[in-house]
């Protein structure tokens, strides 16, 4: 697979599903089989370009501790996802999963070469820790915005109390006004919808709503909510 990259990628496109099943069912050899898996990613120049988990790790930032992925029906949808905004800002690669089975496989692996595998829509990602420590730049914010924003968060939290777990300031959003993220340990929305298709009684879990205090729409809402 390593020495004949093009030939292996052709093989993977034809028989990759079989190897994926091996990762899922052959627990003893799952780490070896995981080396044979191939993915597209945010750093790939085209939807046809593939890379291995080992190649992903080799390209990780020096202080990056986790492997990240996002799941959607196609690459175009993932490119527009608000979950990717912080990754673009930090220039961190994200694996693109379009096969519904891929996320089950990666969540089953848990880690690769001692690097935890995490979905980009999870609440507490390691790459967000530095953002938590940064002092918020308030130079372009309206006067007395801090109190207005806190009041807006409380209002939204009360309004959506029966539909969300929490409402808080986001440290991942750059361009979008808000997003919903999964609490730790909860499958992604994509996987939960797949589960719901086979189990009508399955209820999709409540999410955490994150609000981007820098977004103009949020600032206007805060002013109107005063």
Model-derived segments and spans:
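Conserved GHKL (Bergerat-fold) ATPase module
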Residues: 1-226
């Amino acid at each position: 697979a390593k020495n004949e990259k093009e030939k292996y990628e052709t093989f993977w496109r034809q028989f990759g599903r079989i190897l994926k099943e091996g990762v899922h069912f052959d627990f003893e050899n799952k780490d070896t089989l995981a080396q044979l898996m191939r993915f597209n990613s945010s750093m790939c120049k085209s939807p046809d370009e593939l890379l291995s988990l080992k190649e992903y790790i080799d390209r990780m930032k020096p202080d990056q501790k986790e492997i990240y992925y996002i799941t959607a029906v196609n690459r175009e949808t993932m490119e527009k996802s608000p979950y990717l905004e912080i990754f673009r800002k930090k220039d961190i690669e994200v694996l693109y999963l379009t096969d519904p089975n891929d996320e089950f496989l990666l969540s089953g692996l848990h880690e690769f070469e001692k690097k935890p595998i995490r979905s980009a829509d999870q609440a507490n990602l390691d790459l967000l820790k530095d953002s938590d420590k940064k002092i918020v730049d308030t130079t372009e914010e309206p006067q007395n915005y801090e109190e207005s924003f806190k009041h807006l968060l409380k209002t939204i939290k009360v309004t959506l109390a029966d539909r969300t777990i929490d409402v808080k300031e986001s440290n991942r959003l750059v361009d979008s006004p808000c997003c919903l993220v999964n609490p730790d340990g909860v499958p992604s929305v994509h996987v939960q919808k797949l589960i719901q298709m086979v189990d009508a009684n399955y209820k999709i879990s409540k999410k955490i709503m994150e609000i981007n205090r820098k977004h103009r729409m949020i600032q206007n809402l805060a002013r109107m909510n005063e």
